[in-house]
């Protein structure tokens, strides 16, 4: 769905499947509503019909009906709100394949870790809300049985060396202490070794993800976070072909040597734990 006015162009995505299916069955499924006439286009854009001004009001009404079932195709949200988007999409899914800048660390926090890192200068109500949000997201992710995360080395290094968690705005927390980082990494190791989750680190020589992709049973989320982890540009689609394509891409990356194997990735996690334990011993 596209709307243009006053020199501005906006794109919307129709989330109401029934409306989309109804439109797709019409021979001329695309329409352009102008002030004085309406242009109807066939699905392949090879044929067109021009309707005169008496059709404008009818097609405007149809357009706004579709628009009411639509949301902006691209949206910018603060990172704290992005956690709520993740919760909404992951709450009823049994499958999640992810291309991430960092392994999915929010799946391995607990209330003790959250209380250790949360910014104590935040209002008490905000601290409680953030704690509840993170715990709910952790619960959702733990429940997902078919779970694959393909992530970058840079993101893992930032967590191990600096305690940075990309999915949480920097002003909301302080870096986890060495012991808490070890605890979270150990949970990553346990997930890989038991098969509860599957984490694969991307080989640096192959590709570097710039944005993140999160696929679920019936939706896919594209996310690009700014350098301060304060805002994210997001796009949510609910097209089965797109979901299937990106899940197939991630399976291809895993099976065609673009990533380290589960065993190799687990060894990398263990090496990181050893480095952190050595730092603890030197304190």
Positions of predicted regions on the chain:
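Hydrophobic protein-protein interaction segments
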Residues: 1-252, 258
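Charge-biased C-terminal accessory regions appended to nucleic-acid-, cytoskeletal NTPase
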Residues: 246-283
């Amino acid at each position: 769905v596209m709307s243009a006015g006053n020199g501005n162009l906006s794109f919307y995505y129709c989330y109401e499947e029934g409306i989309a299916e109804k439109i797709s069955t019409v021979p001329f499924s695309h329409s352009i509503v102008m002030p004085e006439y309406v242009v109807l286009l066939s699905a392949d854009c090879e044929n067109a019909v021009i309707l005169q001004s008496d059709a404008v009001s009818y097609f405007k009404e149809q357009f706004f009906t579709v628009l009411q079932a639509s949301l902006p195709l691209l949206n910018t949200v603060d990172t704290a709100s992005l956690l709520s988007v993740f919760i909404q999409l992951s709450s009823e899914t049994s499958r999640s394949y992810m291309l991430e800048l960092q392994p999915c660390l929010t799946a391995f926090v607990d209330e003790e870790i959250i209380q250790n890192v949360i910014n104590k200068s935040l209002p008490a109500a905000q601290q409680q809300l953030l704690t509840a949000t993170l715990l709910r997201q952790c619960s959702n992710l733990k429940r997902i049985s078919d779970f694959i995360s393909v992530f970058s080395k840079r993101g893992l290094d930032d967590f191990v060396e600096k305690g940075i968690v990309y999915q949480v705005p920097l002003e909301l927390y302080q870096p986890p202490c060495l012991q808490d980082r070890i605890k979270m990494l150990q949970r990553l190791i346990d997930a890989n070794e038991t098969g509860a989750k599957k984490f694969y680190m991307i080989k640096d020589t192959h590709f570097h993800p710039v944005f993140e992709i999160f696929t679920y049973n019936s939706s896919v989320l594209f996310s690009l976070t700014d350098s301060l982890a304060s805002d994210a540009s997001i796009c949510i689609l609910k097209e089965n072909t797109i979901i299937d394509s990106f899940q197939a891409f991630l399976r291809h990356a895993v099976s065609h040597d673009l990533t380290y194997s589960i065993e190799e990735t687990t060894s990398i996690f263990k090496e990181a734990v050893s480095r952190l334990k050595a730092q603890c011993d030197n304190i």
